[in-house]
Amino acid sequence: MERPVSSSAPTAFTPAGGYGDTSRSRYERELPAQILSDDEALADGVPDLRGTWKVAALLVNGVAAPADHHLWAHFERIEQSGNRVIVVGGGVIHDFASCDGTLENGLHDVMAIDFTTPLQVAARFDDGVLVMRPHGMPVEVKRWREGEQLVWEYSIAFTARLNRIA
């Protein structure tokens, strides 16, 4: 059975070894070409998270992260169409075909940590927040807008504030 996908673009996946020059750190790789069209409408009630974002503030376990923490180098692009969200960053392309809260229509890809460990994630929008729930893990990953910034919260591990760079 084919998964429902918002937009005419086929489901995108992380290539073997991650996207870009695999001899470079996952934070130094050039983002691949945009997958979705800029002119595709969002579904009713879906917040606009689109753009390319760079970490500007970082708390780890509630404390300001040291300058050498790897997440300071993180940048990502979020693409949206209808109820579909694609997060491209850190070497991975995470395409949520439909953010309807089901694993079936969620992400089926690999983890950024090694580009090989399978990852399934259900996602949905709750009161303007994109809430992602990885299968078999007791965590939630959230993204939402606060003014001009994007907030990225990874359970209790870290909270990053990102500024739009494109």
Briefly describe each language-model feature range:
Residues 58-61, 86-146:
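Contiguous, well-ordered beta-strand patches that form the walls/edges
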Residues 1-84, 165-166:
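Amphipathic/hydrophobic helical signal segments and adjacent flexible N-terminal regions
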Residues 76, 85, 130, 160:
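A broad, low-specificity signal marking well-ordered, structured residues that form hydrophobic/aromatic
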Residues 159-165:
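Edge beta-strands of extracellular beta-sandwich domains
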Residues 149-157:
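Short, exposed beta-strand-loop hairpins at the edges of beta-sheets
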